[in-house]
Amino acid sequence: SEHVHQTRVAIRRLRSALRVFGDWSTDVDPDWQEQLTTLFRELGSTRDRDALSEGLLPQLQQAGAPFVQLPDAPEENSIPIEESLRSLDSINLILALLQFVHQPSKDQKKSGLKKDIAKKLQKLHQQICKDADHFLELDIESQHRTRKRVKRLRYCIEFIASLYPGKELKNYLKDLKPAQESLGQFNDLNVAEAMFQDLVKRKQKVWFILGWIANEKKYILEQAQAHLDTYAKTDTFW
């Protein structure tokens, strides 16, 4: 499943680049976002299950859970992964992206490149700082949005890292990373909770797991809030 995971990460990174920097070229096809999203979903969530098996299950075992096993995976996708990647739509998308990368650009970015980068990064930075002000009061969807913003910002910084002094950039990422990790852990717990809620009617022992997850979510949420508070005070490098 590692190659599938890496493909999904690559798609996430590309979607972030197109979303934030896509206006730099008139050759960017606006349909690519939707096509990449479709392909991402078709690749399924096997990696989510692997991550839970490696991280959550040992914790449950250590906590003395009477039942330590992930629920069976739902039939979420009737299209095999290799078939999805070999489909005409996927091949056309890959060819279009390759053509975009290798063809000479008609658009020559003007001298205000760093100014434009700063504007884009500042927008994401401010959105995350605004969320940090009241993160614990946000609903689940808004907290999920914060997680995606943090991840998108990190990807964007990695894309333009060579243009900025290393020390300031590293310090910024150092304060961003803990927030990303705690938000990722919170998301994993939400995924696990949804999995086990479907099973609890058939297996009463699962109540222990749901109780443990609920308690862990409270702890991770407070940790995420603390990490976001620290991040909100960090100096920007742009």
Model-derived segments and spans:
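Function-determining surface determinants
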Residues: 1-238
